[in-house]
């Protein structure tokens, strides 16, 4: 069993516990309290100004690195990101492997104005309405974690309740599957979720297979200005 499979198995256990605490009806009522912030448009606005559109990540830990930040204050991190020009925030909500918490979404939303992405392993429709109920504007669908029928059903449900969707791929086969649902936003993850190895070349290799009308996000491995510049130049040369 690889890392992704272990995470999915544990995620399913977490979902059962969540369902016991809050019903779908409860979540639907909670979801009505938020006005959507436009996640995709926030990114596109920066791109239209020829600026880097950064989705800044709020993450305490990961399976590959362990604890990343001992003194972890998600609100302080979020407000710092916003002050320094982030377009959007990506909030890890997986608890067993990333030490996240879904409550971070609501806490952070109250302190910032920019849109929020719930970054988690979505494998059940319950998580989709849960995402909206806790204040996220966008959710992540990982093609490697879903079959093609789940991908379409989850995408359709999320968009029907006015959530933006970031569809994540890791290779050409997954990209071809993603394109069958006509997403507006595709993320190429430079991290292999089976091994957790990172190569930014992954984005450069796959980018030309994505239609120009689709907003492209490069994920993972961008940790300094030089790498960011390389990705910006690669993006500009898309056919």
PLM features: residue spans?
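Conserved N-terminal beta1-alpha1 strand-loop-helix module at the mouth
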Residues: 1-105, 110-114, 157, 163-182, ...
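Hydrophobic faces of well-ordered beta-strands that scaffold small-molecule active sites
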Residues: 54-56, 89, 116-119, 139-141, ...
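Alpha-helical segments flanking ligand/cofactor-binding loops in enzyme cores
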Residues: 79, 106, 129, 152, ...
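Active-site-proximal loop/helix of nucleotide/amide-processing enzymes and allied scaffolds
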Residues: 100, 117-119, 125-127
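Conserved anion-binding
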Residues: 123-195
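Catalytic core of soluble alpha/beta enzymes
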Residues: 170-216, 221-229
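Conserved small/polar residues in nucleotide/adenosyl-binding loops
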Residues: 230-239
């Amino acid at each position: 069993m690889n890392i992704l499979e272990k995470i999915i198995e544990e995620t399913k256990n977490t979902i059962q516990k969540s369902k016991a605490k809050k019903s779908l009806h409860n979540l639907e009522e909670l979801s009505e309290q938020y006005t959507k912030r436009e996640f995709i448009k926030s990114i596109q606005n920066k791109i239209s100004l020829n600026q880097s559109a950064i989705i800044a990540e709020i993450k305490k830990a990961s399976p590959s690195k362990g604890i990343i930040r001992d003194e972890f204050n998600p609100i302080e991190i979020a407000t710092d990101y916003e002050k320094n020009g982030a377009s959007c925030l990506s909030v890890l909500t997986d608890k067993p492997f990333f030490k996240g918490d879904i409550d971070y979404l609501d806490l952070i939303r109250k302190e910032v104005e920019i849109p929020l992405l719930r970054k988690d392993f979505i494998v059940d429709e319950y998580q989709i309405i849960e995402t909206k109920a806790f204040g996220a504007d966008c959710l992540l669908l990982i093609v490697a974690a879903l079959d093609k029928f789940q991908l379409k059903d989850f995408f359709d449900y999320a968009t029907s309740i006015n959530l933006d969707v970031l569809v994540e791929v890791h290779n050409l086969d997954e990209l071809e599957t993603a394109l069958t649902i006509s997403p507006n936003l595709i993320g190429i993850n430079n991290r292999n979720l089976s091994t957790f190895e990172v190569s930014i070349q992954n984005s450069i290799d796959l980018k030309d297979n994505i239609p120009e009308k689709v907003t492209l996000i490069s994920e993972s491995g961008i940790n300094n200005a030089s790498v960011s510049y390389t990705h910006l130049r690669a993006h500009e040369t898309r056919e």
